């Protein structure tokens, strides 16, 4: 069975404690009061000492971590392991189920490009993918990179998740970026496929890169000492010195680089949530100074796609909140040259555009559902429809520009992933490949899409997966995020089936702050409106109870990163509503983090959360920040995770929050912290580790809804 040895080793390595034994005593977090005065407002932080002042040093040199902090984190890990020890067999069982259902790891179907077919697959027993190709007209497979082999002997290994072809346009090179330490400082490698020689690694890459259209240069984004993407360099694919292409001096902006699908140019883009600016690198002369398209203007967002003799511009210009499409000539991509092509339509959010030789494909979100729309050069639109109440659609990022087909994937919470080719001339679709899932019968499950009324009357989309015939109301797990305009995809998860088979309703709350209902849905939770996200999440939980889909007090909340605001706020506002909460690398110490100029995300975050240097923003953040608002209440069981090398949301966020929750809770339910002492924000992505981590969270959720932690039901 896939990765079974690793998974069983994970379970058996945990400390043993029989079910029914008393809970061990939690670590005592010393209270060292620190008074923080800002804008004439004073507050006391008893756990500020957990935030090491020179924390960036510990990212590159973990041994420099204050011994008292390390000792505390080790004690928290030991306590977490001891409390969860009675679930070891359950974790192993869940891990086996997830692995068994996930044995079809063939990856995406081969993508044609010129004379080759490219694809990746996770081979039986492997933890990382292998990238391959073979001649389009037939011939043997060629291994481009076997990441399971490359990861051998490394404690941490994560491949950069870029939506770019990793091979060069002339098919002579293959490039990849990997984080080998957990601090998200990627190394970029370029391999000559003719000789098999890999050039010396490019250090301190942010993860984004693109090979130039002439296949002579690799363009990459540099990560500085503060972990910010500040420069774009180019280097010969054969090695040599780095040449500065562009430097971004405003810390409020991120940088990215990508090659046009047509190979007609490269785009270097500086952006944040409020503004963007793109420079064009000519395919004819990749060493020339990039040409600015349209200078940055506050509130103006745009991006470009190269399409034949002009650019397609996706933009919010002219009040197009949900974006529109315009065109611009190749020799003048400034705003004054933009011309309307596809006008804005209220409630139709244009999320993504991809140009092909004879057509343009775009993804639009309409009423919290993605739609695929294809336009020819005559401007006529064709819409690909899906007959399910909730689902996910994604465009193939490596689709061939010269093709007359649009390749996309489709899935839903009860429908495994299907890869489909849509013929632009005929409108006929053909299924390229379907994900095979063992021990799974689609008809045993159903998907529902509901609308939960929030406190202000706004209807919040709510997606549910449940197994047919299960008694209700029962337990539920509610996922949420609600930040940065990112949409929670209604995708297929083999892991969620294990919960559904145990009577759980698996739900996703599409709260404001996400992008499911367009840019306006995102903007409805910005700055002085952030509490809408928390209210929406609570409303979704209440709706589950009201519709008798979940039992009162039997709901587990689950989120990640910026979703910590959503979970922490919901626990503070309605602690009795929840049986438990899983908070992965949570953003919960909002006020302190936004005042920390050493955090690489702070300045770019002001368009999202607001600038706390302004009194009204400070006071508003202080009124919802989870850490600041923990109070004496019957909190549910909590499992928080952190990464010691996380440079986005430091380990201390979760550690301080857990300490304050444990100090204030009146319920007796365990408040747990697990810190990956060798990991960062994302965690390791080996197959065995991902499955084991998921099994731990699920076992915690099952235990939480049982209400039994020490052999007796814990009363609120």
Kindly label every feature range from the protein language model.
Residues 334, 396, 402-403, 411, ...:
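Extracellular/periplasmic ectodomains of large secreted or surface enzymes and adhesion receptors
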Residues 122, 316, 411, 479-483, ...:
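Glycine-rich His-Gly loop
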Residues 316-318, 352-358, 362-366, 454, ...:
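C-terminal substrate/ligand-recognition segments
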Residues 149-165, 178, 182, 424-426, ...:
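Cap/lid segment of the alpha/beta-hydrolase catalytic domain
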Residues 263, 275, 299-301, 308, ...:
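Active-site lining segments that contact anionic ligands and/or coordinate catalytic metals
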Residues 509-716:
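Active-site-proximal cap/loop segments of hydrolase catalytic domains
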Residues 2-5, 10, 19-405, 411-417, ...:
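Beta-propeller folds
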């Amino acid at each position: 069975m896939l990765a079974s040895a690793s998974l069983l080793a994970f379970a058996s390595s945990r400390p043993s404690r029989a079910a029914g034994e008393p809970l061990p005593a939690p670590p005592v977090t010393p209270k060292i009061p620190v008074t923080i005065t800002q804008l004439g407002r004073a507050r006391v932080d008893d756990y500020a000492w957990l935030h090491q002042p020179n924390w960036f040093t510990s990212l590159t040199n973990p041994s420099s971590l204050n011994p008292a902090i390390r000792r505390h984190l080790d004690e928290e890990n030991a306590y977490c392991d001891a409390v969860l020890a009675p679930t070891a067999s359950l974790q192993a069982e869940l891990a086996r189920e997830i692995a068994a259902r996930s044995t079809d790891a063939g990856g995406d179907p081969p993508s044609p490009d010129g004379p080759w077919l490219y694809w990746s697959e996770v081979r039986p027993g492997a933890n990382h993918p292998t990238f391959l190709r073979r001649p389009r007209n037939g011939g043997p497979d060629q291994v481009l990179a076997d990441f399971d082999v490359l990861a051998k002997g490394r404690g941490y290994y994560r491949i950069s998740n870029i939506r770019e072809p990793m091979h060069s346009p002339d098919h002579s090179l293959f490039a990849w970026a990997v984080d080998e330490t957990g601090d998200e400082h990627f190394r970029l490698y370029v391999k000559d496929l003719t000789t098999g020689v890999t050039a010396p690694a490019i250090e301190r890459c942010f993860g984004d890169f693109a090979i130039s259209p002439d296949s002579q240069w690799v363009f990459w984004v540099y990560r500085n000492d503060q972990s910010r993407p500040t420069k774009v360099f180019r280097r010969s694919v054969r090695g040599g010195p780095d040449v500065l292409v562009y430097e971004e001096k405003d810390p409020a902006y991120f940088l990215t680089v990508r090659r046009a699908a047509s190979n007609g140019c490269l785009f270097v883009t500086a952006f944040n949530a409020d503004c963007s600016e793109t420079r064009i690198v000519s395919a004819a002369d990749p060493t020339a100074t990039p040409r600015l398209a349209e200078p940055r203007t506050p509130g103006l967002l745009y991006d470009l796609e190269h399409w034949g003799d002009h650019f397609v511009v996706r933009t919010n210009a002219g009040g197009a909140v949900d974006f529109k499409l315009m065109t611009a000539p190749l020799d003048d991509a400034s705003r004054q040259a933009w011309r309307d092509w596809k006008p804005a339509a209220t409630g139709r959010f244009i999320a993504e555009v991809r140009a092909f030789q004879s057509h343009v494909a775009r993804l639009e979100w309409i009423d919290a559902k993605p739609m695929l729309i294809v336009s020819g050069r005559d401007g006529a639109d064709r819409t690909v429809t899906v007959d399910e109440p909730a689902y996910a659609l994604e465009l193939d990022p490596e689709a061939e520009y010269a093709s007359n087909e649009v390749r996309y994937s489709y899935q839903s919470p009860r429908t495994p992933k299907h890869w489909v080719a849509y013929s632009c001339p005929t409108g006929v679709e053909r299924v390229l490949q379907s994900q095979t899932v063992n021990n799974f019968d689609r008809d045993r499950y159903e998907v529902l899409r509901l609308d939960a009324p929030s406190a202000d009357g706004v209807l919040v989309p709510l997606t549910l997966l449940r197994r047919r015939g299960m008694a209700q109301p029962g337990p539920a797990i509610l996922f949420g995020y609600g930040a940065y305009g990112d949409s929670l995809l209604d995708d297929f998860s083999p892991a969620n089936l294990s919960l559904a088979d145990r009577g759980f309703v698996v739900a996703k709350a599409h709260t404001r702050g996400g992008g499911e209902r367009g840019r306006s849905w995102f903007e409805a939770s910005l700055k002085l409106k952030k509490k809408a996200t928390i209210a929406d999440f609570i409303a979704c939980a209440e709706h589950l109870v009201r519709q008798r889909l979940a039992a009162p007090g039997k709901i587990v909340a689950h989120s990640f990163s910026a979703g910590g605001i959503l979970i922490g706020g919901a626990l503070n506002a309605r602690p009795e509503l929840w049986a438990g909460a899983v908070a992965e690398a949570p953003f919960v110490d909002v006020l302190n983090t936004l005042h920390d100029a050493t955090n690489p995300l702070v300045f770019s975050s002001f368009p999202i959360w607001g600038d706390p240097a302004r009194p009204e923003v400070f006071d508003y953040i202080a009124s919802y920040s989870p850490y600041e608002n923990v109070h004496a209440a019957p909190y549910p069981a909590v499992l928080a995770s952190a990464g010691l090398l996380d440079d986005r949301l430091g380990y201390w966020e979760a550690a301080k929050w857990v300490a304050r929750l444990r100090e204030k809770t009146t319920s007796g339910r365990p408040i747990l912290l697990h810190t990956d002492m060798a990991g960062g924000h994302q965690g390791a992505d080996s197959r065995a580790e991902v499955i084991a981590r998921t099994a731990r969270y699920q076992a915690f959720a099952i235990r939480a809804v049982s209400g039994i932690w020490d052999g007796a039901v814990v009363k609120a």
